[in-house]
Design a protein with these regions (language model features):
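Conserved GNAT acetyl-CoA-binding A-motif
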Residues: 105, 112-128
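Residue-level recognition of the GNAT/N-acetyltransferase active site
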Residues: 87, 92, 127
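Conserved active-site alpha-helix within GNAT-family acetyltransferase domains
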Residues: 117-119, 128-150
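Conserved acyl-donor/pantetheine-binding loop and adjacent beta-alpha core of acyl/acetyltransferases
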Residues: 60-88
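Conserved beta-hairpin
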Residues: 45-64
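Conserved acetyl-CoA-binding loop-helix of GNAT-fold acetyltransferases
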Residues: 91, 97-112
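Short amphipathic alpha-helix that is part of the acyltransferase structural core
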Residues: 1-40
Length: 164
């Protein structure tokens, strides 16, 4: 991922205009990224955007991450676990397969304790379309995420252990 720079950006209404010319090539994800609902439906604490720019200052990658508490059951007992939550991660369609998505994950892992103090896991509901036309699951599995369960119609809940 040479000559790219990742910059944290505060979440605001400006994010939608920033993403106006950004297309990853997956229709549902592009619709989400260009929707005002992207901001109103953030179910994570302290969300932050992470933008990847190339030398020409073109936005080539994008991620929103924050903190979430999810319930886990162990031996019949439930506990809530705080973890980093990747709300969305996308790479511009013209810049895919160049290591940008992996670089974003590397960055999120390095900043995990800042995003969510004491987090042991990163959580993502990876886009996984029921019709089989697209799945981000192999990308996350290649990085080391493990599949937990379905999460709604179009997503697979996945976790990554930060301290393996």
């Amino acid at each position: 991922m040479n000559n790219y720079q990742i910059q944290p950006v505060e979440i605001s209404a400006d994010i939608i205009s920033l993403l106006s010319g950004f297309y990853c090539g997956v229709k549902l994800m592009d619709e989400i990224l260009h929707s005002q609902g992207l901001l109103s439906e953030l179910h994570t604490d302290n969300p932050m955007a992470y933008c990847v720019y190339n030398e020409q200052k073109l936005l080539v990658g994008f991620c929103i991450a924050g903190q979430i508490s999810l319930p886990f059951e162990t031996d019949g007992c439930y506990a809530y676990v705080d973890m980093v939550d990747i709300v969305c991660l996308a790479v511009h369609k013209d810049f895919q397969y160049r290591g940008i998505g992996t670089a974003i994950l590397d960055y999120i892992c390095k900043k995990a304790d800042i995003i969510c103090s004491g987090a042991d896991f990163i959580h993502v509901d990876a886009l996984d379309l029921d019709d089989g036309s697209y799945s981000a699951v192999p990308f996350y599995q290649k990085y080391g995420f493990f599949y937990c369960s379905r999460s709604g119609e179009d997503a697979a809940r996945m976790l990554y252990a930060l301290y393996q």
